[in-house]
UniProtKB/Swiss-Prot annotation:
Keyword Membrane: yes
Organism of provenance: Schizosaccharomyces pombe (strain 972 / ATCC 24843) (Fission yeast)
Protein name as annotated: Uncharacterized protein C1687.08
Domain of life: Eukaryota
Keyword presence, Transmembrane helix: yes
GO cellular component: endoplasmic reticulum; membrane
Localization: Membrane
Keyword terms, alphabetized: Membrane, Transmembrane, Transmembrane helix
Amino acid sequence: MFIFNVLTIRCTFHVLFAICYFCDHLLQYISNSRDSKAGLKIFLVFELAVTIFNTVMLQLANRVKNGLTLAILIVSVVMFVYHQQLIVNCKKMLAL
């Protein structure tokens, strides 16, 4: 059981790293984009993905009662912070 938990936590953090890497590139693209419609389409798709991902992660955290819960909550919080940063960048882009 311990090995399963360690592997699951490692996989969770690998997913977090991949999502953060994707978020960084998405934020750069939206910041550098001149086409607000394309940026908004990307934003809406990403917002939906983040909402679904956080919902799934929080449901998983409710079912798991061990050290994995902390890893899941960390992933959810980081996704929320990136989501808020993406919202701010989209608002800046629309203001231009």
